C-alpha cells in the first residue's frame, strides 16, 4: 500500500473532504492534490499535518509501547 493510498484511506475513514484537505495544504486547484497523490510525494511534515487535519496523530510506536508523536510544526 502506497503512502497516498493510506492518505486516501485516512480521508475516507474520517469523512474528510478532499477539497478541504487540499485547501489546508495551500492547493487552489483539484489537480494539485491529484498530482501530489499520483506522485506519492509526502514528507513527514505533510503526513503529520494530514493526521492533524483528520483529528489523528502520526507517531512511531516502539516495542515497549512508548510513542514518539510527530507534529506538523
Language model region names:
Residues 59-73:
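Short, charged recognition helix plus adjacent turn
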Residues 40:
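Major-groove DNA-recognition helix of helix-turn-helix-type DNA-binding domains
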Residues 15-33:
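Short alpha-helical DNA-recognition segment
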Amino acid at each position: 500500500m502506497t503512502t497516498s493510498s493510506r492518505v486516501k484511506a485516512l480521508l475516507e475513514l474520517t469523512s474528510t473532504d478532499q477539497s478541504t484537505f487540499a485547501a489546508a495544504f495551500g492547493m487552489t486547484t483539484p489537480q494539485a492534490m491529484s498530482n501530489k497523490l499520483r506522485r506519492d510525494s509526502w514528507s513527514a511534515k505533510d503526513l503529520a499535518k494530514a493526521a492533524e487535519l483528520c483529528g489523528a496523530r502520526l507517531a512511531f510506536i516502539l516495542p515497549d509501547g512508548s510513542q514518539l508523536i510527530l507534529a506538523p510544526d
